[in-house]
Amino acid sequence: MALIVQKFGGSSVRDAERVFNVADIVTSKYREGNEVVVVVSAQGDTTDDLIEKAMELNKNPSKREMDQLLTAGEQISASLLAMAIEKLGYPVVSLLGWQAGFTTSTAYGSARIKRVNPERIKAELSKRNIVIVTGFQGVNKYDDMTTLGRGGSDTSAVAIAAALHADLCQIYTDVEGVYTADPRKIPKAKKLDFISYDEMLELATLGAQVLNNRSVEMAKKYNIELEVLSSLTRAKGTIVKEVSNMEKMLISGVAKDDNVARISIIGVPDKPGLAFRIFSKLAQKNINVDIILQSIGRNGTKDITFTVEKDKMDAAIELMQTYVENFGATGVVADDNVTKVSIVGSGMESHPGVASDMFEALFEANVNIQMIATSEIKISVLIDKEMGAQAVQAIHAKFFEQIGQ
Protein backbone atom coordinates (compact mmCIF):
# COMPACT_ATOMS: atom_id res chain seq x y z
CA MET A 1 0.00 0.00 0.00
CA ALA A 2 1.28 3.45 -0.96
CA LEU A 3 0.30 6.96 0.02
CA ILE A 4 -0.37 8.91 -3.16
CA VAL A 5 -1.12 12.61 -3.58
CA GLN A 6 -2.89 13.52 -6.82
CA LYS A 7 -3.43 17.05 -8.13
CA PHE A 8 -5.95 17.92 -10.85
CA GLY A 9 -5.94 21.27 -12.63
CA GLY A 10 -8.89 23.33 -13.76
CA SER A 11 -9.17 21.77 -17.21
CA SER A 12 -9.36 18.30 -15.63
CA VAL A 13 -12.50 19.23 -13.64
CA ARG A 14 -14.08 21.83 -15.92
CA ASP A 15 -17.45 20.06 -16.35
CA ALA A 16 -19.45 17.10 -15.01
CA GLU A 17 -17.98 14.65 -17.52
CA ARG A 18 -14.43 15.61 -16.60
CA VAL A 19 -15.25 15.48 -12.86
CA PHE A 20 -16.50 11.90 -13.20
CA ASN A 21 -13.38 11.05 -15.20
CA VAL A 22 -11.24 12.34 -12.33
CA ALA A 23 -13.38 10.41 -9.84
CA ASP A 24 -12.65 7.24 -11.82
CA ILE A 25 -8.88 7.93 -11.79
CA VAL A 26 -8.91 8.58 -8.04
CA THR A 27 -11.00 5.55 -7.11
CA SER A 28 -8.91 3.24 -9.29
CA LYS A 29 -5.88 4.08 -7.12
CA TYR A 30 -8.01 3.62 -4.01
CA ARG A 31 -9.16 0.17 -5.18
CA GLU A 32 -5.51 -0.88 -5.44
CA GLY A 33 -5.30 -0.44 -1.67
CA ASN A 34 -3.56 2.94 -1.69
CA GLU A 35 -4.23 5.88 0.59
CA VAL A 36 -5.25 8.75 -1.68
CA VAL A 37 -5.21 12.51 -1.11
CA VAL A 38 -6.48 14.71 -3.95
CA VAL A 39 -5.77 18.41 -4.49
CA VAL A 40 -8.02 20.29 -6.91
CA SER A 41 -7.97 23.64 -8.68
CA ALA A 42 -11.01 25.73 -9.57
CA GLN A 43 -13.01 24.50 -12.56
CA GLY A 44 -12.01 25.80 -15.99
CA ASP A 45 -12.09 29.58 -16.12
CA THR A 46 -13.78 29.97 -12.72
CA THR A 47 -10.97 32.05 -11.22
CA ASP A 48 -10.98 34.45 -14.18
CA ASP A 49 -14.79 34.65 -14.01
CA LEU A 50 -14.65 35.54 -10.31
CA ILE A 51 -12.08 38.25 -11.00
CA GLU A 52 -14.33 39.65 -13.73
CA LYS A 53 -17.29 39.73 -11.34
CA ALA A 54 -15.18 41.61 -8.81
CA MET A 55 -14.08 44.16 -11.42
CA GLU A 56 -17.72 44.86 -12.31
CA LEU A 57 -18.24 46.08 -8.75
CA ASN A 58 -14.88 47.53 -7.76
CA LYS A 59 -11.89 48.13 -10.02
CA ASN A 60 -9.56 48.21 -7.03
CA PRO A 61 -10.83 45.79 -4.37
CA SER A 62 -8.74 45.00 -1.31
CA LYS A 63 -6.48 41.99 -1.63
CA ARG A 64 -8.07 40.44 1.45
CA GLU A 65 -11.54 40.49 -0.08
CA MET A 66 -10.20 39.17 -3.38
CA ASP A 67 -8.73 36.19 -1.55
CA GLN A 68 -12.04 35.61 0.23
CA LEU A 69 -13.71 35.54 -3.18
CA LEU A 70 -11.18 33.49 -5.14
CA THR A 71 -10.99 30.64 -2.62
CA ALA A 72 -14.61 29.83 -3.52
CA GLY A 73 -13.50 28.35 -6.85
CA GLU A 74 -11.53 25.50 -5.32
CA GLN A 75 -14.23 24.87 -2.72
CA ILE A 76 -16.74 24.27 -5.51
CA SER A 77 -14.40 21.84 -7.30
CA ALA A 78 -13.63 19.89 -4.13
CA SER A 79 -17.29 19.50 -3.18
CA LEU A 80 -18.35 18.45 -6.68
CA LEU A 81 -15.57 15.87 -6.92
CA ALA A 82 -16.52 14.50 -3.50
CA MET A 83 -20.12 14.16 -4.66
CA ALA A 84 -19.01 12.29 -7.79
CA ILE A 85 -16.89 9.89 -5.73
CA GLU A 86 -19.82 9.37 -3.34
CA LYS A 87 -21.97 8.53 -6.36
CA LEU A 88 -19.47 5.80 -7.28
CA GLY A 89 -19.84 4.35 -3.80
CA TYR A 90 -16.56 5.28 -2.12
CA PRO A 91 -15.93 7.01 1.25
CA VAL A 92 -14.69 10.55 0.75
CA VAL A 93 -14.36 13.86 2.58
CA SER A 94 -13.48 17.30 1.22
CA LEU A 95 -11.44 19.81 3.23
CA LEU A 96 -10.71 23.48 2.76
CA GLY A 97 -7.10 24.60 2.97
CA TRP A 98 -7.37 25.68 6.59
CA GLN A 99 -9.10 22.42 7.55
CA ALA A 100 -6.23 20.54 5.91
CA GLY A 101 -3.73 22.42 8.10
CA PHE A 102 -2.33 25.03 5.70
CA THR A 103 -0.87 28.07 7.47
CA THR A 104 0.49 30.80 5.23
CA SER A 105 2.14 34.20 5.32
CA THR A 106 -0.01 37.33 5.34
CA ALA A 107 0.70 38.33 1.72
CA TYR A 108 -2.81 38.26 0.28
CA GLY A 109 -2.84 37.09 -3.32
CA SER A 110 0.67 35.64 -3.21
CA ALA A 111 1.00 34.00 0.20
CA ARG A 112 3.75 31.52 1.00
CA ILE A 113 3.11 28.28 2.82
CA LYS A 114 4.68 28.46 6.28
CA ARG A 115 3.67 25.01 7.50
CA VAL A 116 1.21 22.19 6.95
CA ASN A 117 -0.25 20.35 9.95
CA PRO A 118 -1.41 17.06 8.41
CA GLU A 119 -3.19 15.63 11.46
CA ARG A 120 -6.72 16.11 10.09
CA ILE A 121 -5.74 14.50 6.79
CA LYS A 122 -4.10 11.60 8.62
CA ALA A 123 -7.22 11.12 10.74
CA GLU A 124 -9.41 10.91 7.65
CA LEU A 125 -7.01 8.52 5.92
CA SER A 126 -7.08 6.26 8.99
CA LYS A 127 -10.84 5.91 8.40
CA ARG A 128 -10.06 4.79 4.83
CA ASN A 129 -11.53 7.98 3.42
CA ILE A 130 -10.38 9.49 0.16
CA VAL A 131 -9.38 13.03 1.14
CA ILE A 132 -9.95 15.95 -1.22
CA VAL A 133 -8.22 19.24 -0.42
CA THR A 134 -8.73 22.64 -1.98
CA GLY A 135 -5.48 23.80 -3.56
CA PHE A 136 -4.23 27.36 -3.91
CA GLN A 137 -5.26 28.47 -0.40
CA GLY A 138 -4.61 28.51 3.32
CA VAL A 139 -5.15 30.69 6.37
CA ASN A 140 -2.86 33.30 7.92
CA LYS A 141 -2.18 34.23 11.54
CA TYR A 142 -5.23 36.51 11.52
CA ASP A 143 -7.47 33.57 10.54
CA ASP A 144 -8.03 35.17 7.13
CA MET A 145 -8.19 33.10 3.96
CA THR A 146 -5.20 33.59 1.67
CA THR A 147 -4.33 32.44 -1.84
CA LEU A 148 -0.94 31.28 -3.08
CA GLY A 149 -1.01 32.95 -6.49
CA ARG A 150 -1.24 31.36 -9.92
CA GLY A 151 -0.04 27.77 -9.94
CA GLY A 152 -0.54 27.53 -6.19
CA SER A 153 -2.42 24.23 -6.41
CA ASP A 154 0.76 22.50 -7.62
CA THR A 155 2.56 23.88 -4.58
CA SER A 156 -0.29 22.80 -2.29
CA ALA A 157 -0.04 19.23 -3.59
CA VAL A 158 3.72 19.02 -3.09
CA ALA A 159 3.43 20.56 0.39
CA ILE A 160 0.89 17.91 1.41
CA ALA A 161 3.08 15.18 -0.08
CA ALA A 162 6.02 16.45 1.97
CA ALA A 163 4.00 16.71 5.19
CA LEU A 164 2.62 13.19 4.77
CA HIS A 165 5.90 11.68 3.48
CA ALA A 166 3.95 10.47 0.46
CA ASP A 167 5.37 7.85 -1.86
CA LEU A 168 4.40 9.76 -5.00
CA CYS A 169 2.85 13.08 -6.02
CA GLN A 170 1.02 12.94 -9.35
CA ILE A 171 0.28 16.20 -11.17
CA TYR A 172 -2.50 15.70 -13.73
CA THR A 173 -2.74 18.22 -16.57
CA ASP A 174 -4.08 18.35 -20.12
CA VAL A 175 -0.76 17.12 -21.58
CA GLU A 176 0.77 13.67 -21.21
CA GLY A 177 3.99 14.79 -19.56
CA VAL A 178 7.01 17.01 -20.05
CA TYR A 179 8.09 17.40 -23.67
CA THR A 180 11.30 18.55 -25.33
CA ALA A 181 9.30 21.56 -26.61
CA ASP A 182 5.69 22.69 -26.65
CA PRO A 183 3.99 19.85 -28.58
CA ARG A 184 1.28 22.25 -29.75
CA LYS A 185 3.94 24.28 -31.57
CA ILE A 186 6.56 21.63 -32.40
CA PRO A 187 4.85 18.48 -33.79
CA LYS A 188 8.03 16.42 -33.43
CA ALA A 189 8.48 17.26 -29.74
CA LYS A 190 9.19 14.15 -27.69
CA LYS A 191 7.81 13.22 -24.30
CA LEU A 192 10.49 12.64 -21.67
CA ASP A 193 10.37 9.55 -19.45
CA PHE A 194 12.12 11.48 -16.68
CA ILE A 195 13.68 14.86 -15.98
CA SER A 196 15.73 16.17 -13.07
CA TYR A 197 14.45 18.69 -10.54
CA ASP A 198 16.97 21.27 -11.73
CA GLU A 199 16.02 20.88 -15.38
CA MET A 200 12.30 21.04 -14.59
CA LEU A 201 12.85 24.12 -12.45
CA GLU A 202 14.67 25.87 -15.28
CA LEU A 203 11.93 24.99 -17.78
CA ALA A 204 9.20 26.10 -15.37
CA THR A 205 10.99 29.40 -14.77
CA LEU A 206 11.36 29.86 -18.53
CA GLY A 207 7.61 29.66 -19.04
CA ALA A 208 6.96 25.97 -19.68
CA GLN A 209 3.38 25.77 -18.39
CA VAL A 210 3.53 22.25 -17.01
CA LEU A 211 4.58 22.75 -13.39
CA ASN A 212 4.73 25.82 -11.18
CA ASN A 213 8.36 26.63 -10.33
CA ARG A 214 7.61 26.98 -6.60
CA SER A 215 6.26 23.43 -6.56
CA VAL A 216 9.42 22.10 -8.20
CA GLU A 217 11.61 23.94 -5.68
CA MET A 218 9.64 22.36 -2.85
CA ALA A 219 9.74 18.89 -4.42
CA LYS A 220 13.53 19.12 -4.71
CA LYS A 221 13.91 20.39 -1.14
CA TYR A 222 11.92 17.50 0.32
CA ASN A 223 12.89 14.92 -2.32
CA ILE A 224 9.29 14.32 -3.42
CA GLU A 225 9.08 12.29 -6.62
CA LEU A 226 6.64 13.89 -9.06
CA GLU A 227 4.84 12.40 -12.03
CA VAL A 228 3.37 14.71 -14.66
CA LEU A 229 0.63 13.03 -16.68
CA SER A 230 -2.67 13.63 -18.45
CA SER A 231 -6.10 13.18 -16.89
CA LEU A 232 -7.54 12.65 -20.38
CA THR A 233 -5.52 9.55 -21.24
CA ARG A 234 -4.10 6.77 -19.11
CA ALA A 235 -0.66 7.04 -20.71
CA LYS A 236 2.47 6.94 -18.60
CA GLY A 237 3.75 10.40 -17.72
CA THR A 238 7.11 12.03 -16.98
CA ILE A 239 8.86 11.41 -13.66
CA VAL A 240 10.57 14.42 -12.05
CA LYS A 241 13.28 13.25 -9.66
CA GLU A 242 16.95 13.43 -8.76
CA VAL A 243 18.74 11.63 -11.57
CA SER A 244 22.06 9.83 -11.68
CA ASN A 245 24.90 10.84 -13.97
CA MET A 246 24.13 7.92 -16.28
CA GLU A 247 20.52 9.09 -16.66
CA LYS A 248 21.36 12.67 -17.54
CA MET A 249 20.31 13.81 -21.01
CA LEU A 250 22.49 16.21 -22.96
CA ILE A 251 19.47 18.44 -23.67
CA SER A 252 16.06 17.97 -22.08
CA GLY A 253 14.12 20.77 -23.67
CA VAL A 254 13.81 23.99 -25.62
CA ALA A 255 11.67 26.81 -24.21
CA LYS A 256 10.55 30.24 -25.39
CA ASP A 257 9.65 33.06 -23.03
CA ASP A 258 7.86 36.08 -24.50
CA ASN A 259 7.44 37.82 -21.13
CA VAL A 260 10.70 39.70 -21.46
CA ALA A 261 11.89 43.22 -22.27
CA ARG A 262 15.35 44.67 -22.87
CA ILE A 263 16.49 47.89 -21.23
CA SER A 264 19.75 49.71 -22.00
CA ILE A 265 21.33 52.54 -20.02
CA ILE A 266 23.52 54.47 -22.43
CA GLY A 267 26.69 56.34 -21.56
CA VAL A 268 27.10 55.26 -17.96
CA PRO A 269 30.27 56.78 -16.42
CA ASP A 270 32.88 54.04 -16.08
CA LYS A 271 33.28 54.28 -12.31
CA PRO A 272 33.29 51.66 -9.52
CA GLY A 273 29.96 50.99 -7.81
CA LEU A 274 27.56 52.31 -10.45
CA ALA A 275 26.43 48.84 -11.57
CA PHE A 276 25.74 48.03 -7.91
CA ARG A 277 23.60 51.14 -7.58
CA ILE A 278 21.60 50.30 -10.69
CA PHE A 279 20.77 46.74 -9.76
CA SER A 280 20.23 47.40 -6.07
CA LYS A 281 17.60 50.01 -6.99
CA LEU A 282 15.85 47.46 -9.19
CA ALA A 283 15.99 44.84 -6.45
CA GLN A 284 14.44 47.26 -3.95
CA LYS A 285 11.44 47.57 -6.28
CA ASN A 286 11.19 43.76 -6.64
CA ILE A 287 12.19 43.94 -10.30
CA ASN A 288 14.02 40.76 -11.21
CA VAL A 289 16.90 41.09 -13.68
CA ASP A 290 17.86 38.17 -15.91
CA ILE A 291 20.41 38.59 -18.71
CA ILE A 292 23.03 41.33 -18.23
CA LEU A 293 25.44 42.72 -20.82
CA GLN A 294 27.99 45.47 -20.26
CA SER A 295 29.82 47.02 -23.21
CA ILE A 296 32.73 49.42 -22.87
CA GLY A 297 32.39 52.59 -24.92
CA ARG A 298 34.69 55.52 -25.52
CA ASN A 299 35.52 58.54 -23.41
CA GLY A 300 35.24 56.71 -20.10
CA THR A 301 31.65 55.50 -20.50
CA LYS A 302 29.89 52.16 -20.89
CA ASP A 303 26.44 50.86 -21.81
CA ILE A 304 24.63 48.48 -19.45
CA THR A 305 21.87 46.33 -20.94
CA PHE A 306 19.65 43.92 -19.06
CA THR A 307 16.33 42.10 -19.36
CA VAL A 308 13.30 42.22 -17.07
CA GLU A 309 9.81 40.75 -17.16
CA LYS A 310 7.71 42.64 -19.68
CA ASP A 311 5.11 43.69 -17.13
CA LYS A 312 7.89 45.29 -15.05
CA MET A 313 9.35 47.25 -17.97
CA ASP A 314 7.57 50.57 -17.35
CA ALA A 315 8.50 50.57 -13.67
CA ALA A 316 12.12 49.77 -14.54
CA ILE A 317 12.25 52.55 -17.14
CA GLU A 318 10.85 55.10 -14.71
CA LEU A 319 13.39 54.07 -12.09
CA MET A 320 16.28 54.20 -14.55
CA GLN A 321 15.26 57.64 -15.84
CA THR A 322 15.84 58.90 -12.33
CA TYR A 323 19.21 57.15 -12.33
CA VAL A 324 20.19 58.80 -15.62
CA GLU A 325 19.50 62.24 -14.17
CA ASN A 326 21.39 61.54 -10.95
CA PHE A 327 24.50 59.83 -12.26
CA GLY A 328 25.25 61.38 -15.60
CA ALA A 329 24.27 58.67 -18.09
CA THR A 330 22.99 59.92 -21.43
CA GLY A 331 19.75 57.96 -21.86
CA VAL A 332 17.56 54.89 -21.43
CA VAL A 333 16.40 52.73 -24.33
CA ALA A 334 13.81 49.93 -24.02
CA ASP A 335 12.48 47.25 -26.36
CA ASP A 336 9.74 44.72 -25.61
CA ASN A 337 9.67 43.26 -29.13
CA VAL A 338 12.05 40.52 -28.04
CA THR A 339 11.86 36.94 -26.82
CA LYS A 340 14.16 34.63 -24.90
CA VAL A 341 14.89 31.16 -26.24
CA SER A 342 16.68 28.66 -24.02
CA ILE A 343 17.96 25.12 -24.01
CA VAL A 344 18.11 23.16 -20.76
CA GLY A 345 20.01 19.97 -20.00
CA SER A 346 21.96 18.64 -17.06
CA GLY A 347 24.27 16.74 -19.41
CA MET A 348 25.68 19.84 -21.07
CA GLU A 349 27.94 20.64 -18.12
CA SER A 350 30.16 17.71 -19.10
CA HIS A 351 29.80 17.96 -22.90
CA PRO A 352 31.63 20.77 -24.74
CA GLY A 353 30.21 22.19 -27.94
CA VAL A 354 26.55 22.52 -26.95
CA ALA A 355 26.57 26.31 -27.24
CA SER A 356 28.29 26.06 -30.60
CA ASP A 357 25.60 23.69 -31.89
CA MET A 358 22.85 26.00 -30.65
CA PHE A 359 24.41 29.06 -32.27
CA GLU A 360 24.95 27.12 -35.50
CA ALA A 361 21.25 26.23 -35.58
CA LEU A 362 20.33 29.89 -35.14
CA PHE A 363 22.81 30.96 -37.83
CA GLU A 364 21.37 28.45 -40.29
CA ALA A 365 17.88 29.78 -39.52
CA ASN A 366 19.09 33.37 -40.07
CA VAL A 367 18.31 34.35 -36.47
CA ASN A 368 20.37 37.18 -35.01
CA ILE A 369 21.44 36.93 -31.35
CA GLN A 370 21.22 40.10 -29.26
CA MET A 371 22.29 38.80 -25.85
CA ILE A 372 23.55 35.51 -24.37
CA ALA A 373 23.42 34.05 -20.86
CA THR A 374 24.72 30.69 -19.68
CA SER A 375 24.71 28.50 -16.59
CA GLU A 376 25.76 24.91 -15.93
CA ILE A 377 22.52 23.50 -17.34
CA LYS A 378 21.05 26.35 -19.42
CA ILE A 379 21.93 28.54 -22.38
CA SER A 380 19.63 31.46 -23.20
CA VAL A 381 19.64 33.90 -26.09
CA LEU A 382 17.64 37.08 -26.62
CA ILE A 383 16.34 37.53 -30.17
CA ASP A 384 13.69 39.43 -32.13
CA LYS A 385 10.23 38.27 -31.09
CA GLU A 386 9.14 37.59 -34.65
CA MET A 387 11.93 35.01 -34.98
CA GLY A 388 11.01 33.11 -31.81
CA ALA A 389 9.03 30.23 -33.31
CA GLN A 390 11.59 29.78 -36.09
CA ALA A 391 14.42 29.70 -33.56
CA VAL A 392 12.74 27.07 -31.38
CA GLN A 393 12.06 24.90 -34.43
CA ALA A 394 15.66 25.17 -35.63
CA ILE A 395 17.18 24.39 -32.23
CA HIS A 396 14.81 21.47 -31.63
CA ALA A 397 15.68 20.03 -35.04
CA LYS A 398 19.39 20.35 -34.31
CA PHE A 399 19.32 18.55 -30.96
CA PHE A 400 16.39 16.13 -31.18
CA GLU A 401 15.43 15.40 -34.77
CA GLN A 402 18.77 14.94 -36.51
CA ILE A 403 20.36 12.66 -33.92
CA GLY A 404 17.27 10.58 -33.23
CA GLN A 405 16.91 11.38 -29.53
Regions found by a protein language model. Name each.
Residues I239-Q405:
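A conserved regulatory-domain signal marking ACT and ACT-like small-molecule sensing domains
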Residues M1-V216, I383-D384, I403:
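Nucleotide/pyrophosphate-binding catalytic subdomain
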Residues L168-Y172, L226-V228, D290, M371:
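Short hydrophobic alpha-helical runs that function as membrane-insertion/retention elements
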Residues A219:
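Acidic-aromatic/histidine active-site loop/patch
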Residues N34, Y90, I224, I287, ...:
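Short phosphate-binding/catalytic loops that engage adenosine nucleotides
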